[in-house]
C-alpha cells in the first residue's frame, strides 16, 4: 500500500485527507508481481535520478516497474510531479505545481539517448494552470528526442487539455508516432472517478488527432473493477472505434491507498480475454487486455505489432 504522506510529511493528496477509509480487497494470485531491485532496474533508476526526471512508473505506483525498469523501459512524466486534478483513482501528487523546468525537454532527450531506447513513452501531470495546458512543452520534448535520439519512436500519453483551445494542434504538429489519451473509465463513473474531466471531450480529442493527422496512431485505455457494467465497456469500445482509435488497453484498477476509490471487484483473466476478443471484433488494430495491462507496459513491442497490423490491413485493401 502506497502512503498518502510524502517523505517531508506533507499530504500527497490533501483533497483526500478527510475522506473515510475504504475496505481494501485482498489481491488474487494473478495480480501479484515480483518486487523491483535488479541491476537493470538500478541502472535505469540512476539515469532517471541523474537527470532530475520524474516517471509515472514511480509517481503512480505502477505494479510493472520492476519488469519495465529491468529492461530499461521507463515512462517519463514531464511538467513536474504535482497535478492540478484530483482523480479518485490516481496516486500522483495533487496541489499547485511549480513553474515549468525549461531545460526538461533537453534532459529527457539526453536520458532517452543514454538508455538507448528504441521506443519511449512521455506522459505528464495535468497542468490546468498553464494557458496551453503544457502543449508547447510536449512539442519541445518531442523535438528534443528527435534531435538527440533520432531512431527512437515516440509515444505520448497526454492530459485532456480541457478548455485549452489550440493545444491539441500544437502537440499533433510535433508528430509523435502514437498519441495516447486515456478515457480511464466508462462515462457513468466520471463523476466519482474522474470528476475534473469530461468523457465526450476526451473522446473528441482522440477523434481530432485523427482528423489533423491520420498517420498518427491513436490509443486509449480504461481501468476495470470500478463498478462498471460489461455493456458499458462494450459501448465505450464502440465510442472509441467511432473516433477511429487504433489501439485499446484494458487493465485492472488497483487502489493506491484506503483514501482512494475502492476496488469494487477483481476482473478475472478470462473476462479480460473476452474483452480482448470483442475489441478485436469491433475493429481495433491492437488490443492489450489483462489484469496488469497499463498504457505503457510493453509499449515498444506493442508499437511494432500496431505498425505491422496497419500494414497488413492496408495490404488487403
Swiss-Prot record:
- Indicate where this protein is primarily found: cytoplasm
Q: How is the cofactor bound?
A: Binds 2 [4Fe-4S] clusters per subunit. One cluster is coordinated with 3 cysteines and an exchangeable S-adenosyl-L-methionine.
One Gene Ontology molecular-function label: lipoate synthase activity
GO cellular component annotations of the record: cytoplasm
User: Which residue intervals define the domain Radical SAM core in the entry?
Assistant: 69-285
Q: Where is the composition biased (Basic and acidic residues)?
A: 12-22
Listed name of the protein:
Lipoyl synthase
* Gene behind the chain: lipA
Amino acid at each position: 500500500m502506497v502512503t498518502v504522506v510524502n517523505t517531508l510529511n506533507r499530504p500527497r493528496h490533501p483533497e483526500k485527507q478527510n475522506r473515510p477509509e475504504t475496505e481494501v480487497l485482498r489481491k488474487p494470485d494473478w495480480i501479484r508481481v515480483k518486487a523491483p531491485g535488479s541491476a537493470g532496474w538500478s541502472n535505469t533508476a540512476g539515469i532517471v535520478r541523474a537527470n532530475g526526471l520524474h516517471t509515472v512508473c514511480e509517481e503512480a505506483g505502477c505494479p510493472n516497474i520492476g519488469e519495465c525498469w529491468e529492461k530499461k523501459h521507463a515512462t517519463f512524466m514531464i511538467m513536474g510531479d504535482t497535478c492540478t486534478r484530483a482523480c479518485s483513482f490516481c496516486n500522483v501528487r495533487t496541489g499547485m505545481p511549480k513553474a515549468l523546468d525549461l531545460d526538461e525537454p533537453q534532459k529527457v532527450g539526453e536520458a532517452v539517448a543514454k538508455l538507448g531506447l528504441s521506443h519511449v513513452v512521455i506522459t505528464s501531470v495535468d497542468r490546468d494552470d498553464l494557458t496551453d495546458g503544457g502543449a508547447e512543452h510536449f512539442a519541445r520534448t518531442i523535438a528534443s528526442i528527435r534531435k538527440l535520439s533520432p531512431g527512437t519512436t515516440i509515444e505520448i500519453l497526454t492530459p485532456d487539455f480541457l478548455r485549452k483551445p489550440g493545444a491539441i494542434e500544437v502537440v499533433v504538429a510535433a508528430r509523435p508516432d502514437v498519441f495516447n489519451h486515456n478515457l480511464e473509465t466508462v462515462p457513468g463513473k466520471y463523476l466519482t472517478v474522474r470528476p475534473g474531466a469530461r468523457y465526450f471531450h476526451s473522446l473528441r480529442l482522440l477523434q481530432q488527432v485523427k482528423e489533423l493527422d491520420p498517420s498518427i496512431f491513436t490509443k486509449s485505455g480504461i481501468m476495470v473493477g470500478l463498478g462498471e457494467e460489461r455493456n458499458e465497456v462494450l459501448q465505450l469500445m464502440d465510442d472509441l472505434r467511432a473516433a477511429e482509435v487504433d489501439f485499446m488497453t484494458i487493465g485492472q484498477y488497483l487502489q493506491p491507498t484506503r483514501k482512494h476509490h475502492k476496488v469494487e471487484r477483481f476482473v478475472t483473466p478470462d473476462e479480460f480475454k473476452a474483452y480482448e476478443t470483442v475489441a478485436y471484433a469491433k475493429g481495433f488494430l491492437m488490443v492489450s487486455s489483462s489484469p496488469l495491462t497499463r498504457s505503457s507496459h510493453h509499449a515498444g513491442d506493442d508499437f511494432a505489432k500496431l505498425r505491422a497490423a496497419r500494414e497488413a490491413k492496408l495490404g488487403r485493401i
